[in-house]
């Protein structure tokens, strides 16, 4: 009994001693950190244009990828990938059903093969 309690006390002391040594090592050298400024940032011209391409007249136009992304559930790229990937097809069918898309309403918006598969999925789930 004395050996186990002595071992416990020694281990606790070692852990406490090593914890304080590590924390003191982390404190050194951190006090003199300066902010890094980009040389490309000009005063007043720090506006970022994400996902857009600016033309000469100053208007932003979305790329084809961005337009496709905004088409969401019925984008051409999404429908094409659904024809190849059965897992994606099942996930999208589940989203369509959760959003209330009836097979009859989306018949003209999707390829015939996907329509048939969605009709079966809609009835089964």
From Swiss-Prot:
<dbReference type="GO" id="GO:0043657">
    <property type="term" value="C:host cell"/>
</dbReference>
<keyword id="KW-0964">Secreted</keyword>
<dbReference type="InterPro" id="IPR031825">
    <property type="entry name" value="RXLR"/>
</dbReference>
<comment type="similarity">
    <text>Belongs to the RxLR effector family.</text>
</comment>
<protein>
    <recommendedName>
        <fullName>RxLR effector protein Avh6</fullName>
    </recommendedName>
</protein>
<dbReference type="Pfam" id="PF16810">
    <property type="entry name" value="RXLR"/>
</dbReference>
<feature type="signal peptide">
    <location>
        <begin position="1"/>
        <end position="25"/>
    </location>
</feature>
<keyword id="KW-0843">Virulence</keyword>
<dbReference type="GO" id="GO:0005576">
    <property type="term" value="C:extracellular region"/>
</dbReference>
<comment type="function">
    <text>Effector that suppresses plant defense responses during the early stages of pathogen infection. Suppresses cell death induced by effectors and PAMPs in plant hosts. Triggers a hypersensitive response (HR) in the presence of Rps1d. Suppresses BAX-induced cell death and enhan,ced P.capsici infection in Nicotiana benthamiana. Also suppresses effector-triggered immunity induction by associating with Avr1b and Rps1b, suggesting a role in suppressing plant immunity.</text>
</comment>
<feature type="short sequence motif" description="RxLR-dEER">
    <location>
        <begin position="48"/>
        <end position="70"/>
    </location>
</feature>
<keyword id="KW-0732">Signal</keyword>
């Amino acid at each position: 009994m004395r050996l186990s309690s002595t071992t416990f006390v020694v281990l606790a002391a070692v852990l406490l001693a090593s914890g304080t040594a590590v924390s003191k090592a982390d404190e050194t050298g951190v006090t003199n950190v300066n902010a890094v400024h980009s040389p490309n940032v000009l005063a007043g011209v720090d506006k970022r244009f994400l996902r857009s391409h600016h033309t000469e007249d100053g208007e932003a136009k979305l790329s084809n990828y961005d337009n496709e992304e905004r088409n969401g559930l019925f984008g051409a790229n999404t429908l094409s990938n659904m024809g190849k990937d059965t897992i994606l097809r099942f996930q999208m069918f589940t989203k369509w059903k959760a959003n209330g898309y009836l097979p009859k309403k989306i018949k003209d918006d999707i390829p015939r093969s996907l329509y048939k598969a969605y009709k079966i999925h809609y009835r089964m789930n």
